[in-house]
């Protein structure tokens, strides 16, 4: 039986978000072995239990109060929310923050040889999908009637198999659609992973742990989005150098031994430093330009 004094977090056991979720928890300093097949893994250094489950079970576990937190794709979360509302329920939860992984889009796709003049082309058609409620909401808003063909996998083969006229499925690169003679015609929902919390009273110790975890997650995401930049720059062109780095904080300026014409500049930039920018910095007289990843960051 689970210990209710420990924070319970549900993550995807395997699939699109699994590896990124494990990496996030690890970078937040949670020491736990998630490479076994166990359903529940206990953290060694914090009162945290990690439940590894199917992704479409995570929203329900949070909404029903079985776990305290869940890392889940917004598409799966929204589908479960709409499903429960359709059954007359009033599901409750909090979205603590959007995460920086798991990006995808839910799109309509039709056979490549069929004309497309907008969603109206689907009126009265049969559409295969694993997301019937998201699809219904979108087409209801457009005033379009359709027949739903619910499939839990291999949705892209439905038109070729004669099961449906079109599909509504997750798309990342579009390669799978192309391989099955389909083309993406309309994006109906964009999704990323998010961290959600159950509704209801939370023990003070648990809430404090959640707040600590949120601070660490923010630091991990900021670190991944930032770079530490060091260079030597001519003193008379410092403002021009800084202007080339719009995402950077004001730099730390250090003197160079025996060189009064140049200084050492250190700064954190929240924007990617492209080769073109580095070439422009060099043209301004900058040298010894280093762009380094940041492991941890806290403001």
Swiss-Prot record:
The keyword DNA damage does not apply. It holds the Pfam family HisG. The keyword Membrane does not apply. It is found in: Cytoplasm. Pathway: Amino-acid biosynthesis; L-histidine biosynthesis; L-histidine from 5-phospho-alpha-D-ribose 1-diphosphate: step 1/9. Its EC number is 2.4.2.17. Keywords: Amino-acid biosynthesis, ATP-binding, Cytoplasm, Glycosyltransferase, Histidine biosynthesis, Magnesium, Metal-binding, Nucleotide-binding, Transferase. One of its GO terms (biological process) is L-histidine biosynthetic process. It comes from the Bacteria. GO terms for cellular component: cytoplasm. Equilibrium between an active dimeric form, an inactive hexameric form and higher aggregates. Interconversion between the various forms is largely reversible and is influenced by the natural substrates and inhibitors of the enzyme. Catalyzes the condensation of ATP and 5-phosphoribose 1-diphosphate to form N'-(5'-phosphoribosyl)-ATP (PR-ATP). Has a crucial role in the pathway because the rate of histidine biosynthesis seems to be controlled primarily by regulation of HisG enzymatic activity. HAMAP family: HisG_Long (MF_00079). Belongs to the ATP phosphoribosyltransferase family. Long subfamily. This is ATP phosphoribosyltransferase. It comes from Klebsiella pneumoniae subsp. pneumoniae (strain ATCC 700721 / MGH 78578).
């Amino acid at each position: 039986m689970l210990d209710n004094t420990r924070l319970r977090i549900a993550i995807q056991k395997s699939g699109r978000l699994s590896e990124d979720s494990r990496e996030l928890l690890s970078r937040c300093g949670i020491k736990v072995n998630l490479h076994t097949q166990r359903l529940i893994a206990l953290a060694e250094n914090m009162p945290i239990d990690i439940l590894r489950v199917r992704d479409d079970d995570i929203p329900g576990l949070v909404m029903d109060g079985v776990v305290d937190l869940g890392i889940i794709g917004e598409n799966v979360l929204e589908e479960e929310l709409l499903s429960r509302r359709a059954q007359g329920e009033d599901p409750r939860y909090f979205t603590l923050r959007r995460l920086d992984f798991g990006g995808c889009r839910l799109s309509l796709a039709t056979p490549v040889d069929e004309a497309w003049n907008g969603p109206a082309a689907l009126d009265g058609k049969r559409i295969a999908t694993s997301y019937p409620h998201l699809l219904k909401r979108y087409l209801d808003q457009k005033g379009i009637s359709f027949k739903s063909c619910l499939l839990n996998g291999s949705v892209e083969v439905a038109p070729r198999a004669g099961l449906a006229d079109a599909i509504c499925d997750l798309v990342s690169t579009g390669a799978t659609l192309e391989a099955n003679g389909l083309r993406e015609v309309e994006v109906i929902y964009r999704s990323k992973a998010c961290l959600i919390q159950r509704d209801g009273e939370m023990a003070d110790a648990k809430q404090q742990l959640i707040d600590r975890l949120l601070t660490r997650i923010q630091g991990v995401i900021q670190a991944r989005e930032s770079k530490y930049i060091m260079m030597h720059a001519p003193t008379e062109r410092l403002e021009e150098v800084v202007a080339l780095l719009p995402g950077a904080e004001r730099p730390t300026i250090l003197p160079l031994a025996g060189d009064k014409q140049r200084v050492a500049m250190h700064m954190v930039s929240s924007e990617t430093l492209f080769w073109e920018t580095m070439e422009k910095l060099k043209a301004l007289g900058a040298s010894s330009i280093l762009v380094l990843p940041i492991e941890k960051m806290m403001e």
